[in-house]
């Protein structure tokens, strides 16, 4: 199949959720299909076959339109950095016109709220298919008249795996982390909405050590950084090429965000930690409960529960979290996407789980 994949502002490093998902889908689709990977306000990437094209904010561009028309796509995927907004729907309509009516899907990885004006325009501009990663978001968009489906989450299960005891010890020595400590980790944006202040209490517990890795491509909360460092947390606020090493040196992973826009709806860091067979303590965030039931080392934390008690239980119980994601690879997600792109609207109900 000839598929156009478009997402704005793509440039390495792909250490932010939407960019990361778009880049992985480009690569996975290109392994089996003929793919034209495009971005605007980004940078060419030969490894992905990604081409940066000049355009305005509404994607009105003779160059972009010409590239897509000459490619003669059979399907198109648009992963907007703004997710499902009225203007993103309008841009999807522009892309569809460039593709001469090729079936067009818009991928939204975060929920959005709409005014009455926005809802009215979205009903008029809806693309052929909207892919979401939570039942709630899919349902909200279906109520606006969109054909929706769930795109299964994915992780690189070859890159992210269980660490050996030797690897763990060596990495702790390299990063200056106490070898005998119970190490709990968080990877993602250094922002207050991630609820990272909760980690200060854990750092104060005897025998515990907290590691936080902040995204280098997003704005960081300076006061939060100072508080974490002041408490003795190991804080890494630069890009880490081998992010898997941070999971390998850890004993558990924590994701404590509660605000719905704090991350993409199925946070990649949670999937990566599961693939590394770490116990994971997470809020029931976004689409996580839609795809993963609690158990096997995955614990859902609610604010009324004492965090340190739940973390202690997670660290002391058997763990088999890798089994939760072993089949959820990027090639599998790409294959599911191609199936959804070829499905009639009547076949989409409940699709993607």
Where are each of the predicted segments found?
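Donor nucleotide-sugar binding/catalytic pocket of nucleotide-sugar-dependent glycosyltransferases
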Residues: 127-166
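A charged, aromatic-enriched C-terminal amphipathic alpha-helix characteristic of glycosyltransferases
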Residues: 305, 315-345
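Conserved acidic donor-binding segment of nucleotide-sugar-dependent glycosyltransferases
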Residues: 294-305, 312-316
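Glycosyltransferase donor-sugar binding loop
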Residues: 40-43, 187, 209-222
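Nucleotide-sugar-dependent
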Residues: 255-271, 289-290
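Conserved donor-binding/catalytic core segment of Leloir-type glycosyltransferases
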Residues: 4-6, 178-194, 200-207
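Nucleotide-activated donor-binding/catalytic signature segment of Leloir-type glycosyltransferases, i.e.
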Residues: 222-241
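Short hydrophobic beta-strand element within catalytic cores of glycosyltransferases
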Residues: 255, 275, 279-282
């Amino acid at each position: 199949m000839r598929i156009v994949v478009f997402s704005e502002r793509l440039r390495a490093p792909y250490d932010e959720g939407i960019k990361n998902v778009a880049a992985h889908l480009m690569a996975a689709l290109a392994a089996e299909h003929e793919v034209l990977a495009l971005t605007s306000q980004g940078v060419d990437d030969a490894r992905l076959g990604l081409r940066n094209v000049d355009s305005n904010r509404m994607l009105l561009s003779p160059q972009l339109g010409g590239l897509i028309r000459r490619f003669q796509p059979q399907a198109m995927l648009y992963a907007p950095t703004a997710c499902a907004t009225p203007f993103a729907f309008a841009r999807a309509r522009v892309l569809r016109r460039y593709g001469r009516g090729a079936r067009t899907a818009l991928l939204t990885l975060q929920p959005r709220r709409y005014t009455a004006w926005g809802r009215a325009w979205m009903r008029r501009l809806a693309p052929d298919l909207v892919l979401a990663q939570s039942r709630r978001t899919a349902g909200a968009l279906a109520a606006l008249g969109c054909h929706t489906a769930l795109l299964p989450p994915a992780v690189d299960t070859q890159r992210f795996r269980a660490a050996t005891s030797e690897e763990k010890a060596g990495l702790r020595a390299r990063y200056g982390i106490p070898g005998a400590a119970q190490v709990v980790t968080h990877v993602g944006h250094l922002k207050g909405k991630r609820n990272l202040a909760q980690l200060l209490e854990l750092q104060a517990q005897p025998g515990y050590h907290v590691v936080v890795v902040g995204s280098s491509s997003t704005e960081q909360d300076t006061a939060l950084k100072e508080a974490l460092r002041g408490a003795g947390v190991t804080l890494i606020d630069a890009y880490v090429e081998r992010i898997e090493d941070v999971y390998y040196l850890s004993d558990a992973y924590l994701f404590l965000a509660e605000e719905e826009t704090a991350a993409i709806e199925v946070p990649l860091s949670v999937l990566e930690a599961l693939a590394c067979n770490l116990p994971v303590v997470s809020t029931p965030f976004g689409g996580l409960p839609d795809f993963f039931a609690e158990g096997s080392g995955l614990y859902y934390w609610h604010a009324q529960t004492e965090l340190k008690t739940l973390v202690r239980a997670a660290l002391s119980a058997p763990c088999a979290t890798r089994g939760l994601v072993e089949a959820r690879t990027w090639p599998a997600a790409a294959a599911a996407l191609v199936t959804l792109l070829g499905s009639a609207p009547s076949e989409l109900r409940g699709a993607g789980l």
